[in-house]
Amino acid sequence: MQRHLISAADLTRDDAVHLLDTAEEMARVADRPIKKLPTLRGRTVVNLFFEDSTRTRISFEAAEKRLSADVINFTAKGSSVSKGESLKDTAQTLEAMGVDAVVIRHGASGAPYRLATSGWIDAVVINAGDGTHQHPTQALLDAFTMRRRLVGRDAGLGRDLAGKRITLVGDILHSRVARSNVDLLHTLGAEVTLVAPPTLLPVGIESWPCEVAYDLDSTLPKSDAVMMLRVQRERMNAAFFPTEREYSRRYGLNGDRMAKMPEHAIVMHPGPMVRGMEITAEVADSDRCTAIEQVTNGVSIRMAVLYLLLGGNEPAVSHTRIEEK
C-alpha cells in the first residue's frame, strides 16, 4: 500500500482485498468483552474536520481508540480556522506537535492530496471526504459489507467482488461516495451501473468504468446490491429536478420496487438518508437494508486502514492473539 490513503483509485486489487481481510480480523475485536488492541499505543492521530460529520468522525475516533492511539479531535468551528488560518498554517502547527497521522475531511476537492504532498507535515494522511471528489474509507466499508452479504464472512476471505452487479442510484454529480465506489468496485471486479436523471450526472461520465442508465425499474432485477444516494441540496445552487415528489416517483426505492430485486440482493445507503425521498421507511427498516451494518463495518475498516498505514506489516491476528493471552 501507499503511505497515504487519498483516493480509492490508488488501491490495487491486492491492496483492497488485504484491507478487507484485515478488517475481518479487526471485526473480531468487537465481539470481545474488551474491545481494545495495543497496536497504536504511543501514536497520535488528529481528526481534522473542516466539514460537519457524524458517522465518519465518530467511526474514526472509535477505530483509533480501539487501537489504543492518542486521539485529538479538531473542528474548524471554534478553532483558528474560523479566524482565517490557512490549511498550511494548521498543518505546520500539527507538525510541530509531532502527530503521526491526520484524518482530514475538507470541503475543497484535493485538500487531502495537498496536505499529503506539500511537505507541510510528515504524517500519514487519510482522506475522510474531500468536496465532491473522494471518500475512500466509505467505499471500502461498502465493499466489505457487500462481500460479507453476497459472498460470506469466512468464504469471502481472499476474494474480491468479481461478477457482482452493483447499482448506484441518485445524486451522482455531487457524490464523492459514488466516485469512490465506482473506482473501488471496478478494481474488485464488480459490474457497476449508475442510475440518475441526466441533470445529476457529471460531465465526462462516459469515461468512468461503469454503465449509465436512466430507468431504475429495468436495472433492479439484475442487481445484487442497490445503493441509494441522498440528493445533496447543500451543494446545489440550481434546480436539478422538477419536484421532490417527481424525483421520488422516478428514482426512489419503495417496497414495490424492492420486490423486483433478486431475493439475495441487498439495499445499501451511506447515510444520512432522507426517508420518503430516495428511500421509504419500509425499505430502510427492512432486513435487506444494510445501513446500520455499514456503520458497524466502518469501524472495522478504519481500524484496518489505521493499522496497515501506521501499525506495521505483521498480520493483524498476531496482535489479537497477544491481547488475548
UniProtKB/Swiss-Prot annotation:
The keyword Transferase applies. Carbamoyl phosphate binds at residues 55-56, 105, 135, 138, 271-272. GO terms for cellular component: cytosol. It catalyses: carbamoyl phosphate + L-aspartate = N-carbamoyl-L-aspartate + phosphate + H(+). InterPro entries: Asp/Orn_carbamoyltranf_P-bd, Asp/Orn_carbamoylTrfase, Asp/Orn_carbamoylTrfase_sf, Asp_carbamoyltransf, Asp_carbamoyltransf_Asp/Orn-bd. The keyword Transferase applies. Catalyzes the condensation of carbamoyl phosphate and aspartate to form carbamoyl aspartate and inorganic phosphate, the committed step in the de novo pyrimidine nucleotide biosynthesis pathway. Belongs to the aspartate/ornithine carbamoyltransferase superfamily. ATCase family. One of its GO terms (molecular function) is amino acid binding. This is Aspartate carbamoyltransferase catalytic subunit. It comes from the Bacteria. Pathway: Pyrimidine metabolism; UMP biosynthesis via de novo pathway; (S)-dihydroorotate from bicarbonate: step 2/3. L-aspartate binds at residues 83, 176, 230. Keywords: Pyrimidine biosynthesis, Transferase. Heterododecamer (2C3:3R2) of six catalytic PyrB chains organized as two trimers (C3), and six regulatory PyrI chains organized as three dimers (R2). Its EC number is 2.1.3.2. GO terms for biological process: 'de novo' pyrimidine nucleobase biosynthetic process; 'de novo' UMP biosynthetic process; amino acid metabolic process. The gene is pyrB. It holds the Pfam family OTCace_N.
